[in-house]
């Protein structure tokens, strides 16, 4: 029933439901000092007013970089044995039966310069990166096989999130705020809203970060709000088995460069990490684990989904119109980077209720390498592949 309501409501509101450039709650007292370099100024132009949450807690991040191959074993309990034949639906790695029906948590994560380093996002099974105002990006991170104790910084939702969230029936969605139209539309989607307005005790503001990039989720606690009758989620795509080669049409590549506007992103194949190491604005994109150690982001799969963006009629605080990705349904070009190679193919989303499908040039579904996958909703013409000879 909720899906039927969502389909009708989505058509009327999705184009109008632009991002709100301010979180709707008054700013809490914060003694942190905001950097005044030009990059930080760009971030400030689109930052929202923070929620009134501050329990005085801060977290210490180590400057030690731990560069090591990512673990391939993910489960909710270390005491459970993985059952042969069961695979995590979004990661393709072995999983227990109990973990297969565990809650899924979607969190909206900040990626402004003031948000770095983020915490916990490296554990996500799946991350969507989308363009927001000011030429910056934000992440929609999907956690299932492993949910860190803390994740942050959490920011507000965007209209682009609705067609991404709709296929994740029964998932939890944590976020900091958005405009009234987004909130109303979110109520029609078959996800459980566990945003800061509904579950304020499961969030806190760090005092060692500038607002509004200082809202952290007690992500493991958010799982308590999941429904009891969860069903195993359907896999989003097939996964390669051990020893199975990438399709013959795949070509070796060093990686990909993406220009978002104010944010430049690169992925480079890193054999020692077993994935595509991410760089942002010319530097390694490092994130913190829950012990405060910095680690490199290196997902096993990177998908460049070339996407049309339209500018809404809503303006940010600098008078800039706010972009919305046109991904409710449709098709287009996609590059799938996996195991040091690229498959130039197509993406197809038949309707708003299903996940986007990725196929090679022959129309066959692309098999991902087991591990994490990042899907970048890149504006057309804003990405370039890097040949091995370059």
Where are these regions (language model features)?
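Sec-dependent signal peptide recognition
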Residues: 2-8
